[in-house]
Structure formats: structure tokens, C-alpha cells
Amino acid sequence: MLISQRPTLSEEVLTDSRSQFVIEPLEPGFGYTLGNSLRRTLLSSIPGAAVTSIRIDGVLHEFTTVPGVKEDVTDIILNLKALVVSSEEDEPVTMYLRKQGPGEVTAGDIVPPAGVTVHNPNMRIATLNDKGKLEVELVVERGRGYVPAVQNRASGAEIGRIPVDSIYSPVLKVTYKVDATRVEQRTDFDKLILDVETKNSITPRDALASAGKTLVELFGLARELNVEAEGIEIGPSPAEADHIASFALPIDDLDLTVRSYNCLKREGVHTVGELVSRTESDLLDIRNFGQKSIDEVKVKLHQLGLSLKDSPPSFDPSEVAGYDVATGTWSTEGAYDDQDYAETEQL
């Protein structure tokens, strides 16, 4: 460190899942260097656990319903994605849910094996009527970041096994700011203020400690340049860290036109993560989903720094016919007539 006074780290616990950390004093400029590194590592590289696939008794695919259950299978899957779990096992483990109606089915009805904990037992999964019965087998695995359902689809899986989007990251949100602080007569040193919010499966303190350990191991490669570093496994790159939260967003947040929104929902695309795993060809196969819908989706994803699976990195929204980049609006020629679309749907 370039200053004689050793930096200190203090924690202010705001809630059980949110803390604010202060690191000071830091040499001018090091606040942003350290803050950005910690933030990206916290969002992308903290290991966690998530449901990767499910199997519902009597169900062959997600586009159906379960007798006696208010929610359809797609809604049940969306609810299960919000399940907060932790696992001490490196291998996949299986949990079971069996409930007879009437009443609500919650995460507390899940029976986890030893080493697995469900941290939000009050979360609602489904609602059963008098004759309703729900039996679900859930596979939980450990991992990092976000993995779309298409990558969780195992070859040779039995009929009825439904892959699920997995959001492994136990960190929900990380923000930081850098203020000035005083050291003796100088007032231009940095004070890093880091705000960390996590799921109930890990404390912000443990998450920050894990991020720090990861960075120390990585920076050790530069410190020990006399050691051959080629081939060392350093884990996934944090370059896509900022996208993890976006993957979990529902497509409702994209503010799409009625045409595009209804087509995607009907196809079973409910989140941004599910959308970016599709190609343009996949979307064009959807009924009523044409090139204008493709352009609209690409523009909306570009605003989040994302793109469709096969979109070229050079995509420029200003080249889309009818779209005004300056105002973020569509001209009459490029816009959709949702009224006409609604009338067409009724026909």
C-alpha cells in the first residue's frame, strides 16, 4: 500500500441480509479500483445453490396443468425459481414435495435431504383445491452465476424431466461509492462504502469474505510471475456480472408491445434469461412474431447490454427502421398497431 496508515474495514448491519462496509483510508483512485473489483466478483463469482430441474407427477412438459391445482405448470416453475436454498454437497441432490389439498403449497412443504436447507419456507408455490394433489421432485446443484434452462437440459433425461433456469448467485445487489477522507493534513484519500444485499442463504459478511479470497488468489498470479501460470483454473470471468440481475427480470419489464409480449408469453418465454437463449430463427417460428418484433426485442435487449443468442455484436439500434435512438421511440411506420393485432387475435 502506498500510504503509511493501514486501511481498516468496518461493517454496519442494516438487516439480516444487508450490510454496509466501509474501507478507509485508500490511496486516491484505489477506492474505485477496489470497489469495482469487489462488486463484480460479488455479483458473479460467489458460489450458491439452485434448482436445475423438476419432475411433477403426471406431467410430461411445462405447457400443461395439474388437476386440482390453481396454477399451471409454468407458474409453478416460476415460483420454484424463487426458491432460496443452500447445499453442502458438491454433487446434485434431490428434494421432494408432496402435498394433498385443499390449501396452499409452500416451500416449507419441501423435504430436503441432509446438507440442504430451504431458506424461504413461507414462499408460495401453488394452491390446491379439495381434490388437488401435488408431487414434485426437485434437483438442486451448486454453481455460480446464471445458467439458462436450455443448458440444464441433460441428454438422456427421462420423460417429464423439466429443466429450470438456475440463478446460483446468492448476492442480490451490490452498490458502492467513494468519498473523500482525511489522513493527517491530506484530504484527498478515498473512503470506499460498499452496500451488499444477499439472499437468506448467505450473510453479506461471508459473501464479501468469499469475494476477497477469490481476488487474493487471482492477484497472486501477478505477484508470483516466476511461477508458470498457464492452465491454472481461475473460475468463470466476471465480465458478465452485471447481466445476472437482468437475466432474472420478467419480460414485463421490457415494456414490449402487446404483439411481442403475448407471442413470447404464449411460447413460454417469461424472463430475459429465457429470451436471450433464443435465436432470431427461434423467435421467427412463433406465430405472429415477425421481423418488426425481432427488431423491437433486439433494441430492448441492447438497452440492457444484452442480445439474442445469434445477434452480431455490431448491432446498432440506429439502423433499425422506424426507431429513433435519441428519443427511444418508434415512428408510425416502425410502430405496431396493437389495436389491429388485438382484433386479429380475436378472429
UniProtKB/Swiss-Prot annotation:
Top EC class for this record: transferase
Where do the record's region annotations for Alpha N-terminal domain (alpha-NTD) lie? 1-226
Q: Which Pfam families match?
A: RNA_pol_A_bac, RNA_pol_A_CTD, RNA_pol_L
What's the EC number here? 2.7.7.6
According to the UniProt entry, its GO molecular function terms are: DNA binding; DNA-directed RNA polymerase activity; protein dimerization activity
Looking up InterPro entries in the UniProt record yields: DNA-dir_RNA_pol_insert (IPR011262), DNA-dir_RNA_pol_RpoA/D/Rpb3 (IPR011263), DNA-dir_RpoA (IPR011773), RBP11-like (IPR036603), RNAP_asu_C (IPR011260), RNApol_insert_sf (IPR036643)
Region span, Alpha C-terminal domain (alpha-CTD): 241-347
What GO biological process terms are annotated to this protein in UniProt? Answer: DNA-templated transcription
Q: Choose one Gene Ontology CC annotation of this protein and give it.
A: DNA-directed RNA polymerase complex
- Keyword annotations: DNA-directed RNA polymerase, Nucleotidyltransferase, Transcription, Transferase
Domain of life of the source: Bacteria
Query: Belongs to which family?
Result: Belongs to the RNA polymerase alpha chain family.
Q: What is known of its domains?
A: The N-terminal domain is essential for RNAP assembly and basal transcription, whereas the C-terminal domain is involved in interaction with transcriptional regulators and with upstream promoter elements.
Question: What role is this protein assigned?
Answer: DNA-dependent RNA polymerase catalyzes the transcription of DNA into RNA using the four ribonucleoside triphosphates as substrates.
| Name of the protein | DNA-directed RNA polymerase subunit alpha
Q: Which organism is it from?
A: Mycobacterium ulcerans (strain Agy99)
